[in-house]
């Protein structure tokens, strides 16, 4: 049975962490390692992490110390990971069988990773549905990062997240691994993640963050030598608008 490492990054957001950790530790996949990277919180997070470690033993690994931000924390978690398959979770899995189904699909299809759909939620209400589908980065398509679970060897081959990006290092990383079409992904046409919307989560942001993301995204395209970068930018914007229309 392949080992799966699930990584959560957190900083002074205990209530959110409690929800997230509860969902991860309810997963029915047995060979699961849960890694929590805390940026040195002062809100009781360290005490909560110690309780998780005491309750779940070696299944839970954590570190609590200052870091260089979201992507530095994610890189730290990847380095700590001992699993064959690695992914992040800073929100909630859709149900307790998500990880089991992910592993099953990767093994059945012989791919390097898997991704699926996302629902953005506020409380009990779904405010946006994001069906990722299949596509090409040249048409503005990109896997939903919170649903992306990859074999660790992909990170070993292509490197980690670039910390000089502040908001779009995930986009740059996905361009880097997908542009030459050597990394194969399976698509699961189902909701894998419920993503907290607005103030409930650091995973979503406002229009200002979206503009910053577009700027850094264009930089990522040019640095990775993707031709017609402005066309890709336009396609990305249109895909986002269509998601809002369909919600």
Language model features with spans:
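Catalytic core of nucleotide-sugar-dependent glycosyltransferases
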Residues: 191, 195, 204-231
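Nucleotide-sugar donor-binding/catalytic module of glycosyltransferases
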Residues: 1-206
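A transmembrane-helix-recognition feature enriched in membrane-embedded lipid enzymes
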Residues: 224-245
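Short, intrinsically disordered/low-complexity patches at protein termini
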Residues: 97, 209-211, 246-247
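Generic surface-pattern signal
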Residues: 54, 222, 246-247
């Amino acid at each position: 049975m392949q080992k799966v490492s699930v990584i959560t990054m957190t900083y002074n957001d205990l209530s959110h962490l409690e929800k997230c950790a509860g969902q991860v530790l309810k997963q029915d996949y047995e060979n699961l390692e849960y890694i929590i990277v805390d940026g040195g919180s002062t809100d009781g997070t360290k005490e909560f992490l110690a309780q998780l470690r005491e309750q779940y033993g070696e299944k839970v690994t954590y570190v609590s110390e200052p870091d260089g931000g979201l992507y530095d924390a994610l890189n730290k978690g990847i380095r700590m990971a001992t699993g064959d398959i690695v992914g992040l979770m800073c929100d909630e899995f859709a149900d307790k069988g998500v990880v089991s189904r992910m592993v099953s699909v990767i093994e059945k299809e012989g791919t390097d990773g898997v991704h699926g759909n996302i629902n953005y939620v506020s409380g009990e209400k779904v405010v946006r549905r994001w069906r990722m589908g299949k596509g090409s980065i040249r048409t503005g398509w990109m896997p939903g990062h919170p649903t992306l679970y990859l074999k660790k060897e992909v990170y070993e081959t292509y490197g980690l997240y670039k910390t000089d990006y502040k908001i779009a290092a995930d986009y740059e990383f996905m361009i880097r691994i997908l542009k030459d079409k050597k990394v194969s992904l399976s698509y699961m046409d189902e909701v894998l993640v419920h993503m907290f919307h607005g103030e409930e989560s650091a995973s979503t942001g406002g229009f200002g963050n979206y503009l910053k993301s577009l700027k850094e995204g264009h930089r990522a395209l040019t640095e990775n030598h993707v031709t017609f970068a402005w066309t890709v930018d336009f396609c990305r914007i249109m895909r986002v608008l269509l998601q809002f229309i369909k919600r």
